[in-house]
């Protein structure tokens, strides 16, 4: 057993960046994953094109910072993974706010998942540029259930922004 102690954050948005590590040691960025959690457990993903997801995150974090984080993940993990790991992986992140709710900050690495994540599944199911946004939800009632529903333009409808 073990004990993990983490600080409490005023979370505003959960999201991640999805990647693929090749046999040659190259890291390929696959896209953003904007997801929801319930009781600290994954519950669903926004299915939308990359531009829409970037617009959502850019409400809180500058695009330049997101690109810098993406480039740093690729460069740092390329050497770390070379000849050690091949496959999909995701880096979970979150936007947090200060106690007075005046400033947003990026937590760039909440968790590193060395596997195909639900974010990768969401990227595979994401619509084309002109299709409406959807929400992929997973519920558990004696067994897992997957539902995909249309969502409106109001982000509060998606339960993603707190």
PLM features per residue range, with description:
Residues 5-8, 12-13, 20-23:
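Rossmann-like dinucleotide-binding core of oxidoreductases
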Residues 16-19, 92-94:
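Short beta-strand scaffold segments in enzyme catalytic cores
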Residues 109-110:
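Short hydrophobic beta-strand that contains or immediately precedes a catalytic carboxylate
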